[in-house]
Amino acid sequence: MPASLAAVKHKIDSTKSTRQITSAMQMVSTAKLNQIQHHTQTYEVYAEKVKQMLSDLVKSHSATSAASQDDVYAALFKKRAVKKTGVLVITSDRGLVGSYNSNIIKQTLDMMAKHNLDKDNTVFLTVGKTGTEFFKKRGMNVVYEYSGVSDVPTYREVHSIVKTAVQMYSDQVFDEMYMVYSHYVNRITSNVIVHDVLPITEKSLLDDENEAQENTELNNSDVSTAHVSAEYEFEPSDTEIISALVAQYAESLIYGAILDAKTSEHSSSANAMRSATDNADDIISTLELQYNRARQAAITTEITEITGGMTAQE
């Protein structure tokens, strides 16, 4: 086999081996995506109930009367002068996820520019090695970092992230907090979201509830789904119930974002590996065509030489 043919054959074999790897990784990412989607849908039912109950309480006199007595309510609901801004950035630990990480980091930098934030008035809480390494290399103040989030994170697993973020806000390590993460839309699309989480505002809480109710009504247009605010009786007391519920709501936002981000990560990984597999198929087709043409040319040359030799003998 001529050297040129051997080189092309080697490229074909190498590309086929790479294709097998990317195809397998695509299937693994797709399986992880299916698994976490089921988990996320189950959690969203709980999170929506917490939000709905808190929204009802905010609109009721009970929350107003309890607010002056409740340290947690005051800490998480009441705005204060902003000296430091906390930014919770959720990225992946590894690569091979397409533009997933770069989009999140770009959106974070854009958000900082929009709100006039710099390393002197901003602290970072980072989930994922990519974000941690990026901001540390640029001299940013990373006050909390976490890596190794599992493929389907449970609340118990990421409990320290959630609790630390809320506690740091309560301890005035920062006076407001944003979350930046990739929101899963569908298997093709993900959008980076910048969400102002703390302090919790009544407007955002009620807007979220109205949006959720509108979506429910659209999905169930043939059924009356209007939400009726409930009358609550408190045991042991309204102050204790509201205190627990406000903290749960803040924590549910953060945990929900981690689940959403992980879902988007698996989707991005599956898409990146599918794209790599498709590209490998294109390369293999091109190389095989090149190989066949070169082989045909070599055969034609050999036949011509043999024919020429026989003619010369005659």
From Swiss-Prot:
Short name of one Pfam family: ATP-synt
Signal peptide start and end residues: none
Gene3D superfamilies for the chain: 3.40.1380.10, ATP synthase, gamma subunit, helix hairpin domain (1.10.287.80)
InterPro entries cross-referenced by the UniProt entry: ATP_synth_F1_ATPase_gsu, ATP_synth_F1_gsu
A biological process term (GO) from this entry: proton motive force-driven plasma membrane ATP synthesis
Subunit structure: F-type ATPases have 2 components, CF(1) - the catalytic core - and CF(0) - the membrane proton channel. CF(1) has five subunits: alpha(3), beta(3), gamma(1), delta(1), epsilon(1). CF(0) has three main subunits: a, b and c.
UniProt protein name: ATP synthase gamma chain
Species per Swiss-Prot/TrEMBL record: Limosilactobacillus reuteri (strain DSM 20016) (Lactobacillus reuteri)
Lineage: Bacteria, Bacillati, Bacillota, Bacilli, Lactobacillales
